[in-house]
Amino acid sequence: MLFALTMLSACATFYQKQADVMDAVYNGNINRAEALMNDARWHKPKRNRLLFYLNKGTILWMNGKNIESNQYFLKADLFVEDYRKNYVTELASVLINPNYNTYIGESFEQILLHYYATINFVQLGDLDNALVACKRMIATSQKINDYLENKNKYRRDAFAHNLLGMIYDAQGDYNNAFIAYRNSLNIYKEDYKPLLGTEIPLQLKKDILRTAKTIYFIDEVEKYEAEFNLKAELLPEGYAPLVFFWNNGLGPVKDENSVNFVTYPSQNGYVNFVNVELGLNFPIYVGNEEDRKKVTALNIVRVAWPKYVTRVPTYKNAVLKDSLNNVFKLDVGEDINAIAFKSLDDRMLKEIGEAILRFALKQAAVALAKKENEGAGAALSILSAASEKADTRNWQFLPYSINYTRAYLPIGKQNIVLETSSNDSIEKNNFFVNIEKGKTNFQAFQTLQFDGFADKYGNRINLY
């Protein structure tokens, strides 16, 4: 009975397992979510430790606890850096279930943990450490790119370079700010637009022109004015900048996808796993003729792998308004939903191939166990069938997208309003900020609302 309960528990997706925490976040009860995170026993195993650090760090940030939040993001960074594969556990996970692997994060999750560290530091007014954290964000993306064979992937983070430019900008280092902004522009043009459909932020264009004009890069000013069809504008006298980040909604969650493959015997010890509808054929080496017959006798094999499901954000766009009703539109800087889908799509064949290999290894183990002990073989056969489960773990408190703007406000205490627009309403959130001469004020805000789930094509679905 204990075994059966354990297997039923394992069948729940990662999203279902933390339903209480998610409900607290959805209802805006961040204090309760923080308390539940402390009691979440399923976070304690090492294989889920990184997710505990990431989710706890995000909730603490939402609660305005920047210092405590960064302690968890530092732990997350060290965990990823120090992780070394446990080959015994790794072998067991191939045979039983990928969920037994230690989770070290999707590539974009490893990159974006440094976004939160950076935002925490800028909100604390610590620009030097913010610069270090942002450079770690870029270094992480470069390190991940070194391991990618197919370069037509999410491999460079445009928003990281954009954010780096904002920090240099705030420090008065306009030369390095311009370089960072220009690097960001190139990545938006070369990677983000064709791969993710993310447009170049209008604010980035304005910042490139402004910093170029500030350091008298006349040729660059003329070049980009023509390219952007904009005029370079400097900071107005008596004003100082406010950089406002809006984390909109919540990023996608992982669910399980599965398809059936038909098995066909091949030559030289191989069995072909074929799905005609998807146009897929995976030749897997099985071994002797007896083992091949056992695998092909099954005829149809179910294979599971993870897929993302969108949490459709309630708010579609937003503007910032000052006390004089000047309007500053927020641009999408990072479409995390699109990045998540692209990252998983890029390795779909690898995921399916590993799932098929896992099935073949399980069948070999069952056959070997039956030779030794019929009862043990039967038990392993049941375990093999029950354990065919995709790894649905992911960092579930990332936003759907990161949006931002730069507003120029008069020196002194100011009241600003963030207006977020849905299909049928506008919500207003008020902020009081102290604008100081010669300083950049950084603010960040999260909206959590979303309107159900959708597949990668935008079709609405019922997840659970």
What are these regions (language model features)?
Residues 70-81, 121-122, 135-139, 169-193:
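TPR/TPR-like (Sel1-like) alpha-helical repeat modules
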